[in-house]
């Protein structure tokens, strides 16, 4: 049980780090205007209204990638025998996906984004499941 909790926390942290790395990588191709920073919510809200479509799609990809990597890492760090015997592990990757989904929903509520961007919420759980399955099927 303790191992499942620890690996979940590590997976979530590394998944969030991967997601932020993807965000910053996408800013190489679509840089923020000079007056906008990631810390300033008001300026970021104004930018979200005029952001290019491809930049917004890269945000969705980075969110799904973070969820995918979080589950992948959590699964890799867990013992393989736990996959068969532990109830805690069955919900480990689900928790990772739900946490990413919740944080995205929170951002959707607090930042101004196009209505179509809510589709972002649909990608977390499938990405988490894919990250889990890629490792679990090797066991």
List PLM regions with ranges.
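Juxtamembrane/disordered regions of integral membrane proteins
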Residues: 1-139
